[in-house]
Amino acid sequence: MMTIGKLTDNLQNVIDNSNLELEVIHSEMDGKNNDSFYKVTVSGGKNGNGKWGEYFSILSKFADAVESNGMEIWLVKMHNDAFDDVFYATFGIRRDEGEIGQ
């Protein structure tokens, strides 16, 4: 498995190359032994007025971009910070071999 820093950089490159309005804000390892995976949180910036539909569309494009780079991805949780009006989503991501973007 690649390092957390390399994963974060590669995921941000996938986001940037796909012109998505997301930012990787946290990455860590999770799971145990042979069932380990990366847990990655992305933020959607200020969408204003709780525009969940737009955010879901961006997250769907993010998941498609990650999958097209050979990784398995699933949604763990998502929430909205009502004070800052920022959307957050945490994903589980797994790749058995190779690197993102190769």
Label each residue range with its predicted role.
Residues 1-2, 9, 95-102:
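Short intrinsically disordered terminal tails
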Residues 2-44, 48:
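An N-terminal amphipathic alpha-helical segment
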Residues 31-90, 95-99:
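Acidic, low-complexity, intrinsically disordered interaction modules
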